[in-house]
Structures are given as C-alpha cells and as structure tokens.
C-alpha cells in the first residue's frame, strides 16, 4: 500500500469523510461480490477489485482510492499497486456473524475526481474450524449391579459453533459389552443422548467402567469432541427416581408475583429407605438466568417464581430438572419443564416520527406527504395491534402504508394567513383491555406563498392641492397592506402611466416606490387642469408578483393668480381709451358707457366689482359706475360748469386675497343740444346693440322668474306682511320702491352662458339685474324656493356639526365670504334668525358649517354655508333685513328701503365676467396686462341701474 493511501486510511477523519460522501453522493452502478473462506491467512487473494470496477491501476492513487466498511474495516485491504483485494487480518466467521446462515463483509469503495462509490460484498465461507464440544468433558455415572437391563442414562449432547454440514454431528461410543449409545432422531430438545445398559453389570468383574462418547461433525476434515464417562457399579440401590411425565408443559402469566407456584414435580423411586428418598433440583446445565428467575423446592418439587417474568424478553422457558434419591450411590431421574409465558397488555405503543418534511408550502396539493410515522408495541396478539388517529380540526390525515407504518398527508388546502402553524397530535392505541395509548406531537409550519395581492383601504382617494404649488410638494400617501409574509408582503408603488392631454402623467406626479408618497413634479394650474385622475399600482415582491390599483382624484384648487381682463369696446379711441359723446340735455340716470371685464379665475377670485377713481380735490363728478354692472351713468343734470371733456378711470377689482385689479379709461365729451344729432349718430351704434341685448335679457328674465316663481311669491307675501307693521312700507310693486342689490364686495365672473335674468321689485322689468347660479342643473329652482320658504316660516337653530362630505369638498376651487350678511328680525324684541352666508373660512369658533342638500345643483364650485355672526350689520327695531340669498345663486339681494340719496349707490346688480377656458390665453393676458388695459374699453349692454 502506498504512503498516500496509508495517510487517508489510518486517520480517523478519513473514515468519517468516506461515510459522509457515501451518504451524499450517488453510488456507482453495479455491485461486486467476492467470497473468501474464514481463517484465511494474511495476504490471501480475494479479487482484482480495481479491474472488476473498471479502474486503471495508475489512477488509484491520484483518485484517492479507498475502502470503507461499516463492519470491521481492518479485515480486508486493497493493494494500490496491483488493485488486488486481499485478507489483511484473521477472519473468524463465528465471531463476525455467529450462527447466522449468511455472513458477508460489506465494503464501500470510494474514488474521487469524479466522486464515485461502489458497493462490494465479500462472503465469508464457513470452514470446519470448530470441533464439537460437550458441556463437560467428564461425567460420572453410578450404576447398581442390580440394575435391570435396558436402563437409559441421559447424556448431554455436544454443540458445534459451525453451521451447515460442519455442525452436523454423529455420535459413537467406545466399544463396550455392557453399554450402547442411543442417539435420538426426533425432538432433540426433549430426548438427550441415552446411554443404554444392554447387559447386567457385575461389580465383582468390573467395579468401574470407562467409556468415551465421541461426537464427529460433517466437515472436511472432520473434527471430533469427546465425553469421558466414568461408570461406577454399585451394589444395592438399583432403581432411579422416575418422573410421572418426561415433559411438563405449563402456562404462566407475565408479571406474575414472586412466590407464585409454577408447577409441582412428582418423581417416584421403587427403592426403599434412603434409596427411595428423592431430592429435586435443576439440572447442572441450567443457565444462571433460569436459576435467578425460578426456584425449585428440593423436597416438595415445587417450582416458584423468583424473578421478573417478561413476555417481551422471554416467552418460553425450557428447564431441565432432575430427581435424585438418597441411595448409595444415588439414582437420578430427569424431566423437562416447558413454561409458556402468557402476554398481558403491559406495554404502551411507541410512536416514531421520521422523514419530517417541513415547512409545508401553503399551496401544497392535497395528498402531499408531510411525515412518515411508525408505531410499535412489544406486546403480542391484540395487545400489540396498534391503531393511530389524529387530533381533530386539522387539515391532515393518516394513511396506512403497511403494518405499523403511516403517512401524514395533507387532507385539505392550507392558508398561512388563517393559520401559520399546526400542532398535530398523533395518538397510538393498542387493542388490549384496558387499552394503552401514547401520543406524539408534530409541529407543522406553513410556508408562505404569494397568494394575496396588496389591498388598499379604499378603492378611490380624493386629494386637494392648491394651484401654483412648488415642484416636488408632497400631495398624498397611499398605503397598501399585504397579508402575506416576508418578501411576499414587501409592497412597492408605481404610477399607471397614461397621457394627460399631450403630456405623460409622469410629468405631473410621481410616487415613491417604497413609501407610497405621491409628489407633484411641477406647479399645477387650476385654469389648465382642474382634476387630475390617475391610478397607483401596488405590487408585492413575490414570484409571480401580485398587484392592485387605487384611483387618486387630485382636485386643483384655484388661487387668485389672474387679474381681471377688460373686454374690447366697439368705440375705442387712441391709447385704448373709450370715447363717448353725451348731450348736455340728458337727464339723470342716462347710461353713458359700460365697462366689461372677465377674470380667468373662478369662484370668489373671479367676482368683480367696479368703481370710479377720482383725483384728489376734484369737483363732484356727475358720473357714477355700477358696482357690479360696470355701467357708467349720469347722476344729475349737466350744466355749463361741467367740463366739456371728462376723463373717467374705472377700477375693476376681483375679491381674491390679495385682490388683483385692472383699469379702464373712458373719455366722455359733453356736446350742446344742437349737436345732439351728431352725438346721436355717434351713440346710435351702441344704443342699437343694446336694444338687441335687451330682447335677449327679457327672455332670460322670464325664464328665471318662472323657475323661481314660488320663491318670489313667498318673498313678496312675507315682505308685505312684514312691511304692514313698519313705519316705512316696502312693497314689490311700482308704488313703493324696493331696492334689490348685492353687498359691496363685488360680482361673480362666470361665462355668459350661465347668466339668468331675474325680475326686480321696483317698477317695470329692467334688464340690469343679472343673477347667476353655479352650475344649477335644470329643474331644481322650485325645490330651492321650497327650502327657502320653510326657513322663513319656521326658523330653527342650525346644527353646528354640519360639514361638507368629501365628495362635495372635492371641487372647492374657492369660496366666498360675504361679511355683510343680513339678519331677519321679527320685530322689536323678536327672535333673530341669522341667514347663512357664503364663506371659505369661518373665523368665529362657534360658527358651524352645513352641506347643501343632495340635488341642490351644487357642483365643484360649491359654497360653504356658515351659520354665525359673520360681523353683520345689525338692523334697528322695526327694520327689514338688508339682504337675503337667492337659492342656487351666490347673489345677495337686498330688500331694505334706503333714502333717496343713497339709492343711487346701492342699486347695482351683479354681473359675471367671462372665464377664460385655456391656460394659453390666460398666460397671454397676464403677460400683456398693461397693453391690454389700453386696448380694451367699455361696452354698453341693455342693463341699466335701478
């Protein structure tokens, strides 16, 4: 053997490594079988193992050829030079395998590069190397000379450690004229060898006889064993004790208590006196274990239990007993006691769990084997018959594969999110009475699979963002939960890309993949994009990944970032100023011109008001401008003191915070009456255009009066009843003037398609009252009137907890806070009913909010109604409220009678400017605001002040 082989084979770790590699790697194909006789000398040739395995001799050392054995590994060795398997040390078959019929040495041949494992079995052939052996080499017999012929003397037979023919024994007795040897042919356990007296003894001729019993096996060469018999011939006691039966068969229950009588032996002796007195004992060849378990009474012959009787250890006892008399010499009688141990159920079953496959995937199919379970019970018959069962309410079952072996299999689908692990209790119960049982617990862990998609708390979220936000501002955070575990629950977020107009959604917003935070990437413009609706996808990290979507509705709230824009006028002079010719003979109330303006914003930010700008120290101007109409009219009769040329500056202001303004210039030339035809020719154009607008407005007034008829009738009736108790009577007819106006905060600017005409309460119908409803759907006007009437008749304290719902707040681009809300009084000392004012912020902590009723026509430009003081102007005793609200419209209508000198300034009605629809046009107007102010003038419509 080479040094390399010696190095790997004589170190302890070499064997361990070889066994490990044997267990891991797939063995080579085929199996070699050799045979070698036992007791072969060192170096005995066994086989050319390298050649038989197909290995070259030159590759044995480089490939680390080595041999491992689970048995004694030093018995055989391989010469790495020639590849021959040879005997390395003494092989004793009896020591190696005992009396087993088959005896083999199993070798594992291992080579590396690549790793291969070969199985080699070497059969050890038995040789006749063990002679027959008697229990004793000498035996003394005492035979009376008076012994009758044909007596039998029992002899213990020999035993041979070999097997097969090598252990087949034949017996021969040395030549004797008195004795012969009788060899039993059947039932060796019952009948031992018998030495037969064939001729009466004559003590006087031979007092002693020496015979040799020779046992010869069947091997080649034959081996023998001898038993020397020393026979003493006695003179008297010629009758040996005799048992009534040669074989006694007894049944004994296991676990019998000590002292339990097993059997009482009965032997008789025909002799008299001491020759007939019998003593009982176990035979000399009884094992120490038998003597420790049983006790025989020498006088009575009773055999009693003296130790533990265990069926599982020994189920049959074979005891040789003898009876000897007190003669001289004593005579012996022999018998055999066969004690059969009866089993009782004294052993509980044992459960062994093997091949546990954990964890179990939650999507494992039904029938998947989880574990192999074996049970055993050392008892016999029904006491050893074991049945197994499982704890209830588990998705598993036991399937019997073969006797005492079960498979724990999946019986129904698993769901880790419902139950992550199971504690399965296996119960094994035998068939004894009473039955014994044992339990074993198997913990089954359920491994997660990606079977749950991330889920959002809501399918849709509504978000409000002010326009002109800084880039990168955090808008909202979406959160999705995943019921899975580990990476299957790791959620990432992304946008569902789409186009918004001509641009991609990702140019507007982005979402953080891990946190779900949504950011606005650029400033949003309410005028360009009021609603940005998109979807966010949440995906987990499982394979395959699962995901779900959530919809985000981002409403862009309006800010006052657009100044009012003047609309062009038909007669624009140099420098963009509007030129008008007015005869000096015209009376008070004559409309000179009208300034028109629009605001691209919405809501409160688009509510416009008009006012004249006067120079400091200037005389009282004969002109005024309608606060909400933009109409420039004459306040008194013109005289010679008035300058012939009047330059009027009209300031147009919205009501945003801060307010934005625009200025219009109107040049008014006063002409004499004889120049009126010329002036009329210059003004004829606008008057003709106004007449056409009057016709249109008449229809609008009729339409809105029809829609609001119920409300108007209610208001007229209520006002008539209230006015009858006041010093100054107010009616809605031509007799008593009733002023209908808005508060001093301005007008709404909406597209002209939304304007409606309403009827004023003073004189004949006019065309200067314009009321607007924020996107009121058709057919809802009468319902609003009914609600207003109920409030008048049965005032109630409002609920301060009313709030907008999220859907109504979604479109609040801005809201209007009318600080001068009217208070309706019932009379002196009567209860006050505060009317709701339109507000976007309620500074008073006690103020409440109320959502408009469903179906009231409120769209994204919704109002927030506030019940509270609102800093109102208190009315004196007996006075009517200053203003009230037309339902469905942001206009505040005043029904309070004012002195004649104040009616001029408070009889203006609101107008609405045209809202720009595109961002491109708004930016153009913002960039050229100063130039547009000069280019745009006033235009006169049919509307005139009241």
From Swiss-Prot:
Is Coiled coil included in the keywords of this UniProt record?
no
- The organism's place on the tree of life at top rank: Eukaryota
Keyword annotations for this protein?
Calcium, Cell adhesion, Cell membrane, Glycoprotein, Membrane, Repeat, Signal, Transmembrane, Transmembrane helix
Entries under InterPro entries matching the protein: Cadherin-like_dom, Cadherin-like_sf, Cadherin_CBD, Cadherin_CS, Cadherin_N, Protocadherin/Cadherin-CA
Which ranges does the record list as Extracellular topological domains?
31-697
PXXP repeats sit at: 734-737, 774-777, 795-798, 828-831, 869-872, 887-890
Which Gene3D superfamilies does the UniProt entry name for this protein? Answer: Cadherins (2.60.40.60)
Q: Which PROSITE patterns match?
A: CADHERIN_1, CADHERIN_2
Which function does this protein serve?
A: Potential calcium-dependent cell-adhesion protein. May be involved in the establishment and maintenance of specific neuronal connections in the brain.
Q: Could you identify this protein by its name?
A: Protocadherin alpha-10
């Amino acid at each position: 053997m080479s040094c390399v082989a010696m190095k790997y084979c004589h170190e302890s770790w070499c064997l361990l490594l070889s066994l490990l590699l044997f267990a891991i790697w797939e063995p080579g194909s085929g199996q070699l079988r050799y045979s070698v006789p036992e007791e072969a000398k060192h170096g005995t040739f066994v086989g050319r193992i390298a050649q038989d395995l197909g290995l070259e001799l030159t590759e044995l050392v480089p490939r680390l050829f080595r041999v491992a054995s689970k048995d004694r590994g030093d018995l055989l060795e391989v010469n790495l030079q020639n590849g021959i398997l040879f005997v390395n040390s003494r092989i004793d078959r009896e020591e190696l395998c005992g009396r087993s019929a088959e005896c083999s040495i199993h070798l594992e041949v291992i080579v590396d590069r690549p790793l291969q494992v070969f199985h080699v079995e070497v059969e050890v052939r038995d040789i006749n190397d063990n002679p027959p052996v008697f229990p004793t080499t000498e035996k003394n017999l005492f035979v009376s000379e008076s012994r009758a012929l044909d007596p039998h003397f029992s002899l213990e037979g020999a035993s041979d450690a070999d097997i097969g023919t090598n252990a087949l024994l034949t017996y021969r007795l040395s030549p004797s004229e008195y004795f012969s040897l009788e060899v039993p042919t059947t039932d060796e356990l019952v009948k031992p060898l018998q030495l037969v007296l064939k001729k009466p003894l004559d003590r006087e001729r031979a007092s002693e006889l020496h015979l040799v019993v020779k046992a010869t096996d069947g091997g080649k060469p034959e081996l023998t064993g001898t038993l020397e018999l020393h026979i003493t011939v006695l003179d008297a006691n010629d009758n040996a004790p005799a048992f009534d039966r040669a074989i006694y068969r007894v049944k004994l229950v296991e676990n019998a208590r000590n002292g339990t009588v097993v059997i009482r032996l009965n032997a008789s002796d025909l002799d008299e006196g001491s020759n007939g007195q019998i003593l009982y004992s176990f035979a000399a060849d009884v094992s120490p274990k038998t003597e420790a378990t049983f006790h025989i009474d020498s006088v009575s012959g009773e055999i009693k239990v003296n130790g533990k009787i265990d069926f599982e250890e020994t189920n049959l006892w074979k005891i040789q007993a003898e009876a000897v008399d007190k003669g001289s010499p004593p005579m012996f009688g022999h018998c055999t006691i066969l004690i059969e141990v009866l089993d009782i159920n004294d052993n509980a079953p044992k459960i062994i769990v093997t091949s546990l496959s954990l964890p179990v995937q939650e999507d494992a199919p039904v029938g998947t084997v989880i574990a192999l379970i074996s049970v055993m019970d050392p008892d016999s018959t029904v006491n050893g018959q074991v049945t197994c069962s499982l704890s209830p309410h588990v998705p598993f079952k036991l399937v019997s594969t073969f006797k005492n072996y079960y498979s724990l299999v999946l019986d129904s689908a698993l769901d880790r999110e419902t139950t992550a692990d199971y504690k399965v209790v296996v119960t094994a119960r035998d068939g004894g009475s009473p039955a014994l049982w044992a339990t074993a617990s198997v913990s089954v862990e359920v491994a997660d699979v990606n079977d749950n998609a991330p889920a959002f708390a809501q399918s849709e979220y509504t978000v409000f963002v002010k326009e002109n936000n800084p880039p990168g501002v955090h808008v909202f955070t979406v959160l999705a939960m995943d019921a899975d575990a580990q990476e299957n629950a790791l959620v990432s977020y992304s946008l569902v890309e789409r186009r918004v107009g001509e641009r991609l959604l990702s140019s507007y917003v982005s979402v953080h993949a891990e946190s779900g935070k949504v950011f606005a990437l650029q400033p949003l413009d309410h005028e360009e994009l009021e609603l940005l609706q998109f979807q966010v996808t949440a995906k987990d990290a499982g394979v395959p990944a699962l995901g779900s979507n959530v919809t985000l509705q981002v409403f862009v709230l309006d800010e006052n970032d657009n100044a009012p824009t003047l609309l062009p006028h038909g007669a624009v002079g140099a420098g963009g100023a509007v030129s008008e010719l007015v005869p000096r003979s015209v009376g008070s109330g004559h409309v000179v011109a009208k300034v028109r303006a629009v605001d691209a914003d919405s809501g409160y930010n688009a509510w416009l008001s008009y006012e004249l700008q006067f120079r400091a120290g200037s005389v009282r101007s004969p002109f005024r401008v309608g606060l909400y109409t933009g109409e420039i009219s004459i306040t008194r009769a013109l005289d010679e003191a008035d300058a012939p040329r009047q330059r009027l500056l009209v300031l147009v202001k919205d009501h945003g915070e801060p307010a934005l303004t625009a200025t219009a210039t109107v040049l008014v030339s006063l002409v004499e009456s004889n120049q009126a035809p010329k002036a009329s020719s210059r003004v004829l154009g606008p008057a003709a255009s106004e007449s056409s607008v009057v016709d249109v407005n008449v229809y609008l007034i009729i339409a809105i009066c029809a829609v609001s008829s119920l409300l108007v009738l209610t208001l007229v009736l209520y006002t008539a009843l209230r006015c009858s108790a006041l010093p100054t009577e107010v009616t809605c007819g031509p007799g008593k003037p009733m002023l209908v106006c808005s508060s001093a905060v301005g007008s709404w600017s909406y597209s002209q398609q939304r304007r409606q005409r309403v009827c004023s309460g003073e004189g004949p119908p006019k065309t200067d009252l314009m009321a607007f409803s924020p996107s009121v759907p058709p057919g809802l006007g009468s319902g609003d009137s009914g609600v207003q009437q109920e409030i008048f008749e049965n005032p109630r304290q409002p609920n301060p907890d009313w709030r907008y719902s999220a859907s109504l707040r979604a479109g609040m681009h801005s809201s209007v806070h009318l600080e001068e809300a009217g208070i309706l009084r019932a009379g002196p000392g009567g209860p006050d009913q505060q009317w709701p004012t339109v507000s976007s912020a309620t500074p008073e902590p006690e103020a409440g909010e109320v959502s408009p009723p469903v179906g009231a026509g409120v769209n994204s430009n919704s109002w927030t109604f506030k019940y509270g003081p609102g800093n109102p102007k208190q009315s004196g005793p007996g006075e009517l409220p200053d203003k009230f609200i037309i339902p469905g419209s942001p206009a505040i209508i005043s029904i309070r009678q004012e002195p004649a000198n104040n009616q001029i300034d408070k009889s203006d009605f609101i107008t609405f400017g045209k809202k720009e629809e595109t961002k491109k046009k708004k930016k153009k107007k913002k960039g050229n605001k100063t130039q547009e102010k000069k280019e745009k003038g006033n235009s006169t419509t049919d509307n005139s002040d009241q």
